Regions:
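A short, solvent-exposed beta-edge/loop patch
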Residues: 111-143
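Generic structural motif
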Residues: 4, 43, 73-76, 115, ...
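Bacterial Sec-dependent N-terminal signal peptides
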Residues: 1-25
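Extracytoplasmic
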Residues: 32-35, 63-65, 92, 103-107, ...
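Early exported N-terminus immediately downstream of N-terminal targeting peptides
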Residues: 22-81, 85
């Protein structure tokens, strides 16, 4: 329950999916053992209340959402591969740890990277002893 609340909180404060890099990551693991995936397109976000999508976080105002990729996994071998890949991706793309919450085996983190003048990338990462959840979110700070 804590993990779900954390993920929903992260979605509310960020509401954004990290374009090409995250699509590749999503595609790599979408058919892996024990993995469940969800993709939310920019068109779906356009159906949402635009005022609700005008999110402000850390002096950054998110004006549009480009999509969101969600990866959930409960297979131990696949989790190990995902964790290795996500650690590499976060270290290579200048992500800053924004929030971290630990409770026993449960650990949740939100990372943010500003890309160029107007794009924001967020990664919401949550794991416990049985599964791992990753949400990639991208958005623009300027109107499209």
């Amino acid at each position: 329950m804590k993990k779900l609340v954390f993920l929903m909180f992260a979605f509310i404060i960020a509401n954004s999916g990290q374009a090409q890099v995250d699509k590749e990551f999503y595609n790599k693991y979408s058919d892996a053992k024990g993995v469940q995936t969800t993709y939310i397109s920019p068109s779906m976000f356009k159906q949402m209340d635009q005022e609700a999508l005008n999110i402000q976080c850390d002096n950054i105002s998110l004006k549009s959402v480009h999509g969101m990729y969600v990866i959930d996994c409960d297979d131990p071998a696949t989790i190990k591969r995902i964790k290795k890949d996500i650690d590499l991706k976060l270290s290579q793309n200048e992500f800053e740890l924004m929030i971290e919450s630990k409770d026993g085996d449960d650990c949740s983190r939100i990372y943010m990277a500003k890309k160029g003048n107007d794009t924001i990338g967020l990664v919401v990462f949550s794991e416990d002893s049985e599964d791992i959840n990753i949400v990639f979110i991208d958005g623009s700070t300027n109107e499209d």
